[in-house]
Amino acid sequence: MSDLTKQMIYDIYVRLLHLNEQKANTSLQQFFKEAAEEDVAEIPKNMTSIHVIDCIGQHEPINNAGIARKMNLSKANVTKISTKLIKEEFINSYQLTDNKKEVYFKLTRKGRRIFDLHEKLHKKKELAFYQFLDSFSQEEQKAVLKFLEQLTSTLEAEQTDGTPDKPVK
């Protein structure tokens, strides 16, 4: 691969990162719009809270450590978010009868509406993504998959130890 091609790939990668940041800012606004159309009155004020609701909805019963692990968040951050979600009545906390130390979370009816709306939006985006992938051949899809797997491994390694590594092969 030529240096020019590598530079073009890198430039597009950086552009993709910037677009992803911008998209994150518009996702909440889109969620608010969809919620209004579905007559969902109360909504958490940030996407992380919505994603915590989604995580709880997908994995009930789940505790603080489970949410932190699945979402790659600190336990302290999950505690802060879950406390707010309990106060806003999107989730409830409870203890299992055989384990009084662990606190688990489940969705309230209000939280379930947020979860269902979030799932609906994700399904719509997933379908659009699959349709986009259909424009590539099987071989091209395999190359994209390999690239994304290796890039993800590299980024996860950097996040774990804080040092940029060479891409994992």
Swiss-Prot record:
Gene deletion effect: Deletion of the gene induces changes of proteins involved in cellular processes depending on iron availability. In iron-rich medium, mutants overproduce a red pigment after entry into the stationary growth phase.
Induction: Up-regulated in response to iron starvation. Negatively autoregulated. Also repressed by CcpA in stationary growth phase.
DNA-binding residue intervals: 64-87
One MF annotation (Gene Ontology) recorded for this entry: DNA binding
Coiled coil location: none
Domain HTH marR-type: start-end pairs: 10-153
A biological process from GO: positive regulation of DNA-templated transcription
Role, per record: Represses the expression of the yvmC-cypX operon, which is involved in pulcherriminic acid biosynthesis. Also negatively regulates yvmA, yvnB and its own expression. Positively regulates yisI expression. Acts by binding specifically to a 14-bp palindromic motif, the YvmB box, which is present in the promoter region of the target genes.
Record note on quaternary structure: Homodimer.
Name under which the protein is recorded: HTH-type transcriptional regulator PchR
Record organism: Bacillus subtilis (strain 168)
Lineage: Bacteria, Bacillati, Bacillota, Bacilli, Bacillales
